[in-house]
């Protein structure tokens, strides 16, 4: 089972989860205070950040189930567990981000390429999953 930590955006928002990521970056865009984040998702994102040497923009991290439904997310989305993030890096193609993410999660984790929307979905699930959105 993937470890997931719970935080409060109000109390813990500025808390560093790694060198370059804080709790508030993973918060649901609906304003909910609760934030759930899997440490191994943070590890993957930090590795991506370090590899490309550029800021990783988290477009969507944790989502409450109602917010996930509102934005058209699938039932049981990894976002609703705190194990997923949709990311983009200015000046780096989604194909390059996805290829690197796949290389550091050879036997686990999900990587979805959303070329038209300009982001990559990365998640810390226990099994391997790859797709193009």
Residue spans for each PLM region:
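Extracytoplasmic cell-surface/polysaccharide-interacting catalytic and binding patches
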Residues: 1-51, 117, 125-133
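Surface-exposed loop/turn and secondary-structure junction residues enriched for glycine/proline
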Residues: 7, 20, 26-29, 65, ...
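Feature targets compositionally biased, intrinsically disordered low-complexity regions
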Residues: 12, 30, 60, 71-75, ...
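Intrinsically disordered, low-complexity peptide-like regions
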Residues: 18, 55-57, 84, 121
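Residue-level signal for well-ordered alpha-helical segments
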Residues: 25, 35, 57, 64-66, ...
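N-terminal start-of-chain detector that recognizes signal peptides
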Residues: 29-31, 56-62, 92-96
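Extended, low-complexity, intrinsically disordered C-terminal regulatory tails
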Residues: 40-72
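Catalytic cores and adjacent binding grooves of peptidoglycan-active enzymes
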Residues: 76-133
